Amino acid sequence: MKKVGVLSLQGDFAAHGAALERAGAQPVFVREREQLNQIEGLILPGGESTTMLKLLRYEDLFDDVAEFGRTKPVFGTCAGAILMAKGVTNPAQESFGLVDIEVERNAYGRQTDSRIAQVRPFPDFENRTAPGELKAVFIRAPIIRRIEDGVRVLASYQGDPVLIEQGRFLVATFHPELTDDARVHSLFLSKL
């Protein structure tokens, strides 16, 4: 069984653990650098990106997670997507810069503007997983404002990319872990 880490300093890491189990993987809740040696891939969960950055620095994990991402698969959702982006606006902030995208934080609005939407994935996603719409939970979600060459869009919402991949990296601006649909997590497992 594949072991996948979920950064567990803040955010919805428990929901990702359950989603990984549904997808057939063993979650490892990463709170210490030594745990990075036990996993094949890492999920950066949703939560609050500035808080995660502070905790990564406080726990002295930032550089270790960055190093992990230089050689291993990483999947970021919502705040995790922000942490993976090369560019962050509204406001600008530090990130791991793993994926050639620029994101705007909280671009769908405030907490009260959060929503659940049905998203039609592109054929490339469906061909590699299964057909059907994705239930996308957007909670103060970022919008991907720019993508560079080599980034593949797998699903969009209102014309904006919401699920992308670049090589071993997967990014969702929504929360697939908050639904019973394990296809996005299964796609990540295929990168391990």
Curated annotation (Swiss-Prot):
Top-rank taxon: Bacteria
For molecular function, the Gene Ontology terms on record are:
glutaminase activity; pyridoxal 5'-phosphate synthase (glutamine hydrolysing) activity
The record lists the catalysed reaction(s) as: aldehydo-D-ribose 5-phosphate + D-glyceraldehyde 3-phosphate + L-glutamine = pyridoxal 5'-phosphate + L-glutamate + phosphate + 3 H2O + H(+); L-glutamine + H2O = L-glutamate + NH4(+)
Cross-referenced InterPro entries, in alphabetical order? Class_I_gatase-like, PdxT/SNO, PdxT/SNO_CS
Which Pfam family is an annotated match for this chain, by its short name? SNO
Keywords from the UniProt entry: Glutamine amidotransferase, Hydrolase, Lyase, Pyridoxal phosphate
Enzyme Commission number(s) of this protein: 4.3.3.6, 3.5.1.2
Residues reported in the UniProt entry to bind L-glutamine: G47, E48, S49, R105, I139, R140
Q: Which Gene3D superfamilies match?
A: 3.40.50.880
Query: Could you tell me which NCBIfam families the record lists for this protein?
Result: PLP_synth_Pdx2
What does it do?
Catalyzes the hydrolysis of glutamine to glutamate and ammonia as part of the biosynthesis of pyridoxal 5'-phosphate. The resulting ammonia molecule is channeled to the active site of PdxS.
Family, according to the entry, reads as follows: Belongs to the glutaminase PdxT/SNO family.
Q: What is this protein called?
A: Pyridoxal 5'-phosphate synthase subunit PdxT
Which organism's genome codes for this protein? Solibacter usitatus (strain Ellin6076)
Organism lineage reads as: Bacteria, Pseudomonadati, Acidobacteriota, Terriglobia, Bryobacterales
